[in-house]
Amino acid sequence: MFRLSDFNYHDKVIFLRADLNSPVKDGKIISDARFRAVLHTIRYLLEHKAKVVIGTHQSKPYEEDYLTTEQHAEILSSLLGVKVKYVDDIFGKCARDAIKALKPSEVLMLENLRFAAEETKQNPLEYCERTHFVRKLSPLIDYVVNEAFAAAHRSQPSLVGFARIRPMIPGFLMEKEIKALTRAYESLERPKIYVLGGAKVEDSLNVAENVLRNEKADLILTGGLVGHVFTLAKGFDLGDANISFLDEKGLIKLVDRAEIILNEFYPYIRTPVDFAVEYKGERVEIDLLSDKQWIFDERPILDIGSRTIEKYSEILKEASIIVANGPMGVFEIEEFAKGTVEVFKAIGESKAFSIVGGGHSIASIYQYNIKGISHISTGGGAMLTFFAGQSLPVLQALKISYEKFKNKKELNQ
């Protein structure tokens, strides 16, 4: 792959594909974490007198947080200390005229890329490069800088479509993500522990199967809905309330697959031994072997219990490499943040090289000011895809672009 230092950006138009997709409450963006993650790259380009055109998506059609990128431009302006112009267009005449009008060290924010139908579909690179988006903008662009690691598992026009048309370069964030994840995956340091929580159960099953089969993990600790599915696969009854919830989410069908994985790797997958529910207005912890399991019929599980936290924390202390994705429970409710916070604190306090990823995981880390984690990944789905051993279209596109343009005359000039 290229590096940012390979090119001269003076007076060049750079399309910077970022992933600034952020949590929203009451119509307002409530986290600037992903904005801060790309500041280094933007500042580098501005210092080298580039004309920077930023493209990002925000949510997807019909969702409440499917907003314009006007707020994104305002937040970025505030963080950069530089005016970021916003244009409510993507590749139409208004957008193209705004790009043509840019001067060196100026920044333009395009409209939410998913307002264009082409950006809501996934297609091979060959199709993406023939879209209106790529055909209209490529004549105006000199280089593409890709910082959208969080979307690296998607194959959409803005993410891969320019790869064979213009040199596509990983930004500092993309480079950092690839380096950290590769180290964790390939490292021979032991023990290597994976912590899989949250709601992306199928993706987590893919990770568990891949890292255990290829001896990339010594132990997997589970929580969140991932833990629920593995607990059911072990034959425990989690009650009507929880089984109904998993069924509504389409996750019950994954119990059989979890059971197959357990049959092959049983000693290496740990599940919670107790859970926490809300009962009569309080946090109540129920041991799986106790006579109080009837509460699971009435109350949904909201967190792992104290015994599980203690067991997981002891295991994490001895780790050399830790990869964690997803919370242990419903951390948004303070009484049920305990599992997530304590497990992530244990990760931070360990001597291990540690990676934590996933939108909810990142939110909990910042909310509870957890320190000591080696690398906080901006990617959730992309990170899981990587550790599942599957190809990431954006990384493939970066390699394709390098092969196409590595002998280009402008290189290093």
UniProtKB/Swiss-Prot annotation:
Q: Which reaction does it catalyse?
A: (2R)-3-phosphoglycerate + ATP = (2R)-3-phospho-glyceroyl phosphate + ADP
Q: Which Pfam families match?
A: PGK (PF00162)
Where is it localised?
Cytoplasm
Q: What is one GO cellular-component annotation here? A: cytosol
Q: List GO molecular-function terms, semicolon-separated.
A: ADP binding; ATP binding; phosphoglycerate kinase activity
Quote the pathway field: Carbohydrate degradation; glycolysis; pyruvate from D-glyceraldehyde 3-phosphate: step 2/5
How the protein assembles, per its UniProt entry? Monomer.
Q: What is this protein called?
A: Phosphoglycerate kinase
